Each structure stands twice: as structure tokens, then as C-alpha cells.
Curated annotation (Swiss-Prot):
Family membership: Belongs to the lyase 1 family. Argininosuccinate lyase subfamily.
Annotated EC: 4.3.2.1
Pathway: Amino-acid biosynthesis; L-arginine biosynthesis; L-arginine from L-ornithine and carbamoyl phosphate: step 3/3
Protein name from the UniProt record: Argininosuccinate lyase
Cross-referenced InterPro entries: Arg_succ_lyase_C, Argininosuccinate_lyase, Fumarase/histidase_N, Fumarate_lyase_CS, Fumarate_lyase_fam, Fumarate_lyase_N, L-Aspartase-like
Gene name per UniProt: argH
GO cellular component: cytosol
Species, as recorded: Prochlorococcus marinus (strain MIT 9312)
HAMAP family: Arg_succ_lyase
Keywords for the protein's UniProt record, in alphabetical order: Amino-acid biosynthesis, Arginine biosynthesis, Cytoplasm, Lyase
Keyword tRNA-binding: no
GO BP term (any one): arginine biosynthetic process via ornithine
Enzyme class: lyase
Length: 459
């Protein structure tokens, strides 16, 4: 099959180079977007009288027929077509004859592929908006049922202060909200039309770029034709936003992996979201969070690939840009499937061990700050109180006891302001309850945030 550019050359491509050069194996994913783009372009050529009304109708009907054949598995793009764009053009010419050769008037594959990729990515971002919202709802529902469940809070992976489990889960809603907002911002820059920029300099053909932009649902057009065909910022921004979202999914995955270990025993996985071992019959493996954690590296790699691809590439379009699609496609699939898997895991795959969680906050010094705050509330300077409590912790460690094991006479030796009610303040439930500052882990604050999120997510 002759290439669209073959008349310039005397010899045919080396078969290996032909395959190496082709993108049809992966850019065929853009077939529906390419058809959508071409239909809008044909309508515009008809509107500006570049095509007659009969030619316009013939081309549009031909493109619609190709779409039907593709959806019915009667048309499968493949080699020797170089890419999806010329594959469709060849198919159109075979269906309607010479008129099909007029479709490419006033455009280049450079602006065409940029348009196709933006249309495809826009749909993916809109789908991610739905998926992330569902993920947030799953976390919120789990939080609602665990407002008064206590869990150790950690810094440096060392016990720090007790928390409401709901408060811990709500932290992820905040992260996912930032992810949603980032994708929305990326969408605003995806939704700009390069169509009509042609190869790099625009065209002398009478076209209406604003018409095609409106037909395809773009917010506006690129104002510089060189920038229009060479811009891949939107690809990098999408993968960057995805990388951050994956980092958040990886973070909760790591926590779940820890929580379900025998050493922590804070939770267990249900049979719906766990697998076993081919050798060890007792095993129940957290494959879902492990896979999400592992897949995060793929997205990071895709981001590095795209950043390297555009580094040092001169204006305008270069063949390097053919390498933008596979990282984009892989990232979109990875982030979407990971979000879906995490939503299922949170909804029906994890059960918290309330008894172990409750016991875990009873047997440590994570209430030490509250012991200091007790003195602060009695007008003792914080740093003085801090040092006093440090001495008490050391005293207890040397004797292998906890604060609750101390007698009032013992604790008074460290500071006279201590009284019997100090032990009430040190109860983990009361410790958490007392954190009433806005955004804190106190139950009233957590309930307030749960209500706020219910309104935000329309639950």
C-alpha cells in the first residue's frame, strides 16, 4: 500500500523501518475521536464553501459509515496503514471515491493528531471525575461508621497521638479533592483546539477554526499555529496530576498493607479482595493494595518519559511526539483501574478490628502531650510542662509501666499541679474528644467535617 507521501520518494521503505515508523498499533485507540474531528472539519469546509453541500454530505456519510463498521467489528485499523489518520482517509476514499481525497484540505496530521488526543483525554478526565467522586464517597461512608473508633496516629512511623479513625480516613478525602481539582485544571488546558493550525504555519484555505472548536466542544482555539502543533504541556500535566493521585492511592495502600499484618492486626481483608498462596495454605495476601503501590511506579515512569521526550525538541512538530500516546494511554488506564480497585477495596474489602484498635491506644505514651496540656491548663508554661512530662515518661519506661499505672502520689512528685482528674484526661477516648480545634480529631469536629463532605458529595 502506497504511503500518503510516497510520490516524493523513488524507493519504498525498508519493511522493518516501516513497522518501526508506524503508530497504527496504538493510535488506533483514537479512531472515534479522529472520526469526530474529521466530521467537524468536513462540516466546516462545507460552511466555508470549500466543499459543495453534496461533497460535504458524501464525506460525512462516509465517515459515519466507517464509524458504524468499526463499532460492529467490521473495520479493524492495522498495518500497512501508517497511522489512524491515513487509515481512515484510505477507507473513506475506498467508500466514496475521489471526493474522499478532499477531506484533508486545510489541515495536517500535526493539528489533527493534537485535536484527536485532546478529545480522547478530555473524555478520560471526565471519567476520572466520576471515579474519584465515587472513591471519595467510599471513604466517607467508612468514616461515618468509625467516628468514635480510635486508632494510633503516627509520625516517623512511631506512635504519636490517638486519633479518630474517621479523621484519618477524611484526610484522604482532602487529598482526593485536590486530585479532582488538579484534573479539572488540566482539563481547561486540554480543552483548547489546535485544529486549523495545519502543519505549523496555518493555511491559505478559507477555514473557520472557531466553528470546528465549537463543534467539538472546545473552549477556545490556540492563537499561535506553531504552539498549537508543538504543545504537549497538557500531556505532561495530565500524567503529573495522575502521578500525584497515584501517590495518594499508594499511601493508603501501604497503610492497609500494614494494618492487615499480624503485627498490627488493625484490620482484615475480606475474601472479595484478597488472594492466597500456591505453597502456604494459611496465607491471605493484600494483592490489591500491593498492585496499586507497584503501579504507581509505572505512572512516575510515564511522567519521566514525557518530560524527556519534550526536552530540547525545537519548534514545531517532531516525530518524537509520536511517543506521547503510549504513556498517556497507559497512565489513563492505570489511574482509572487503580481508583476502581481502591473503591471496591474500601467499600467491601476491608473490615476494621475495633477491639484491637481500642487496645492499641491503651498501651503506649501517645497521651503524653495531653499530660503536658493538663499542666498548661493550670497556667504552667508549656516548655516547663513538656520537660516535666519527659521526666515522667523516662520514669515509667525504667519501671516498665504506663501513665495509668502511676499513683497520684507518684505523679505529684514531678509537679504539684497534678490532681486525681489527670487520669480522666489521659483516657484515650477523652484525649481524642478534647481535640476541638478546627480541623482537629475531636469527635465534634469530625462529625462537622463528615456533614460538610456529605453536602459536597451530595450524599
Amino acid at each position: 500500500m502506497a504511503k500518503v507521501w510516497s510520490k516524493r520518494f523513488d524507493n519504498t521503505l525498508n519493511p522493518f523501518i516501516e513497522k518501526f515508523n508506524a503508530s497504527i498499533s496504538f493510535d488506533k485507540k483514537l479512531i472515534l475521536e479522529d472520526l469526530e474531528c474529521s466530521i467537524a472539519h468536513a462540516k466546516m469546509l462545507g460552511k466555508t464553501k470549500v466543499l459543495s453541500s453534496s461533497e460535504t454530505l458524501l464525506i460525512i456519510n462516509g465517515l459515519e459509515k466507517i464509524k458504524v463498521e468499526y463499532l460492529e467489528d467490521k473495520f479493524s485499523p492495522s498495518l500497512p496503514s501508517e497511522d489512524i489518520h491515513y487509515c481512515i482517509e484510505e477507507k473513506l476514499i475506498s467508500l466514496i471515491g475521489e471526493t474522499g481525497k478532499k477531506l484533508h484540505t486545510g489541515r495536517s496530521r500535526n493539528d489533527q493528531v493534537g485535536t484527536d488526543l485532546r478529545l480522547w483525554l478530555r473524555k478520560e478526565i471526565d471519567n476520572l471525575e466520576i471515579l474519584i467522586t465515587d472513591l471519595q464517597k467510599s471513604f466517607l461512608n467508612l468514616a461515618k461508621s468509625n467516628i468514635h473508633t480510635l486508632i494510633p496516629g503516627y509520625t516517623h512511623m512511631q506512635r504519636a497521638q490517638p486519633l479518630s479513625l474517621a479523621h484519618h480516613l477524611l484526610a484522604y478525602l482532602e487529598m482526593f479533592q485536590r486530585d479532582r481539582e488538579r484534573f479539572q485544571e488540566v482539563r481547561s488546558r486540554v480543552n483548547i483546539s489546535p485544529l486549523g493550525a495545519a502543519a505549523l504555519a496555518g493555511t491559505k484555505i478559507k477555514i473557520d477554526r472557531n466553528f470546528t472548536a465549537e463543534e467539538l466542544g472546545f473552549d477556545k482555539i490556540y492563537k499561535n499555529s506553531i504552539d498549537a502543533v508543538s504543545d504537549r504541556d497538557f500531556c505532561i500535566e495530565f500524567v503529573s496530576a495522575s502521578a500525584l493521585a497515584m501517590s495518594h492511592l499508594s499511601k493508603i495502600s501501604e497503610e492497609i498493607i500494614l494494618w492487615v499484618t499480624d503485627e498490627f492486626s488493625f484490620a482484615k481483608l475480606t475474601d472479595k479482595c484478597a488472594t492466597g498462596s500456591s505453597l502456604m495454605p494459611q496465607k491471605k495476601n493484600p494483592d490489591v493494595p500491593e498492585l496499586i503501590r507497584g503501579k504507581t511506579g509505572r505512572v512516575y515512569g510515564n511522567l519521566q518519559a514525557l518530560l524527556t521526550m519534550v526536552k530540547g525538541v525545537p519548534l514545531a512538530y517532531n516525530k518524537d511526539f509520536q511517543e506521547d500516546k503510549e504513556p498517556i494511554f497507559d497512565t489513563a488506564e492505570t489511574i482509572s483501574s487503580s481508583i476502581k480497585a481502591m473503591t471496591i477495596l474500601i467499600t467491601e474489602g476491608i473490615e476494621f478490628n475495633i477491639k484491637n484498635l481500642s487496645e492499641s491506644v491503651q498501651n503506649d505514651f501517645s497521651n503524653a502531650t495531653d499530660l503536658a496540656d493538663y499542666l498548661v491548663c493550670k497556667q504552667v508554661p508549656f516548655r516547663t510542662a513538656y520537660h516535666v512530662v519527659g521526666e515522667i515518661v523516662k520514669y515509667c519506661l525504667e519501671r516498665e509501666i504506663l501513665f495509668k499505672d502511676l499513683k497520684i502520689s507518684e505523679i505529684k512528685k514531678f509537679h504539684p499541679e497534678f490532681d486525681e482528674d489527670v487520669f480522666v484526661d489521659l483516657e484515650p477516648f477523652n484525649v481524642v474528644k478534647s481535640r476541638t480545634s478546627e480541623g482537629g480529631t475531636g469527635f465534634t469536629q469530625v462529625e462537622k467535617e463528615v456533614n460538610n463532605w456529605q453536602k459536597k458529595l451530595l450524599l
